[in-house]
Amino acid sequence: MATLLSLRFRLSWLALIVLFVVGLELRYAQFGVGFSDVPLAIRGALDQLASGGNPYVPVPGSSIPPFPYGPFAVLWYLPMHDPRFQEFIVAIMATTLLAFRGEPMGLALWATAPLTVNLASDGSNDHTAAVLLLVALLVLERAPRAGALLIGIAATFKIYALAWLPPIFFWAGAGAFAAGLAGAALLWVPAAILWGASNIFATFQAADAVHKTPYFSLAEAVSRTRVHVTQSTFDILRLIAGATTAAVLSPFVRTHRGVVVAGMAIYFVTLYAGFWSTPAYLIPITLVVCWFIDDALGPPLTRIRWPSDPFGLITEAVNRRWPKVDAARIGAP
């Protein structure tokens, strides 16, 4: 009905409203369904911090899982102290942003995909990571060094955002790459000084050790052939595979789109070529794909404009102040 009305009266934005409402309803219906131990780990770290302890040192004898996230995650979840609900809000914000932009294919995919719906409130924290990554990639297209800095900051939430730094080096040069490292150091260095680098590394190792069986990974696929797999072997393999992917793809990157795609490939190989992984790691890639898919695959000028086109006005203002740059070895900040 909304589609017929939009065709008859040129109210195409009704389709955006329908998709947005469907996305909200699906997420609301699934709220609290599913389980992730991420909220337990985050709350445990926040409780430790509130009591004057170290978020990267678990309480002896406690059943709370280790906290294998960056210091930005501590700051991000501290005010609400409710990671599940906070991630649900972020998921709604991402849906709102896509609807406001008006690209129908990306909005439809994000609003209705079972992956994004089911993981909006299961407790995993990859929606926040996805939004941080998307913002950084959008800034990167206009201000490479600032965007790379934001990539580094995103890596202080979840370290896997660093997957985009190798292609950034070959696209925008050493200055942008250094900005990315500086962004990562901005919070990781103080955290290492305050809470101890050895404690942080030990927490990451303890989090890996929790997973006793391969899951959603290359190791699981191999184990289905009745070949014995060991965690240590595949943990090393995924690092080698990720580094190899970066070395093979990054030197050929010459466009912003190339940075996005190469980073996604490095990210995917590094996270899924190991012993254990999770569907939640696909959320950042999915949000990035949903943002760019209409421009990449659809016919030109498919964006649906809201009355007065506020997104278009914002885009025009941004283009005048920060035009897109898309050439290899960019020297601009």
Name the predicted role of every residue range.
Residues 1-137, 141, 145, 172-282, ...:
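Primarily membrane-embedded glycan-assembly and transfer machineries that use lipid-linked glycans
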Residues 149-170, 273-281:
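Transmembrane helices and adjacent periplasmic/lumenal helix-loop junctions
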